[in-house]
Amino acid sequence: YEMQRSLVGSEMCIRDSTNTPDVEISDRLCEGTLTAIIKEAYRVKQQPDNYAARANIMWCGTVAHNGTCGVGREEDWASHALEHEISAIYDVAHGAGLAVIFPAWMAFMAEHNPAKIAQFAHRVFDIPKSEDLEEMALAGAARLKHFFRYMGLPVGFKELGIEHPDIDRMLVSLRRNKGELLGNYVKLTMTDCREIYRLAL
C-alpha cells in the first residue's frame, strides 16, 4: 500500500514537471492531487481504518493514471526509465524504486531547471517563495523525501537492501533501452543519469 502511494505521488510529479507554457489548469490539477495524496496519506498513517481517507487516495490514483492531468503538456518519464533498471536488476517493486529515484531526480533538476520544481515546492509543501529557485526546488525535494520516509518508504539504495548498486551496469542497460538521451524537462545524458543514481545513494 505504501508503495502504491509512492507510485501515485511520483506519477503526479512527473506530469507536473513540464516545459510546456500556459498550462495553469493542469498545473493546478497535478498540484491539487498531490496535496490531497499527502494529506490523506498522513490521515491513513494515523488512522489505518479511515475509509474516507483511503477512498480519497484511490480516487487520486485514478486521476493520476487516467491522463487527465497530462492533457496539453509534455511530460517527463526519465525517472521511470531510471527506476526500471533498478527493478530489472535488483527485483525491486516499482513504487519503492520511485521513492528512491524521484527525490534524487528532483534534486538534480533543482540545479538544471528549477522553475517547475520550485513551483511544486511552494504550492504543495508551502516552501516560501524566493528569488533563489534552486534553493526552493531543493527544499521541495527534501520535503518529498521526508514524506516518503515518514510513510515507511525507502529513500536510498541502502534502504532497498542494495549496499553497493552497480551503477555502470544500470547505465549500460539504460543506454541500450533508451539511447544516449532521455527525458523532456531536461534532456539527460548518461553522465547526468549517473549523477542522479549517485544522489540516490
Predicted feature descriptions by range:
Residues 1-3, 72, 86, 181:
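Alpha-helical hydrophobic/aromatic positions enriched in membrane-embedded helices and signal peptides
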Residues 117, 124, 128-201:
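C-terminal charged capping/lid subdomain of soluble metabolic enzymes
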Residues 12, 97, 101, 162:
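Residue-level recognition of oxygen-bearing side chains
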Residues 18-143:
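Active-site segments that bind and position negatively charged phosphate/pyrophosphate groups
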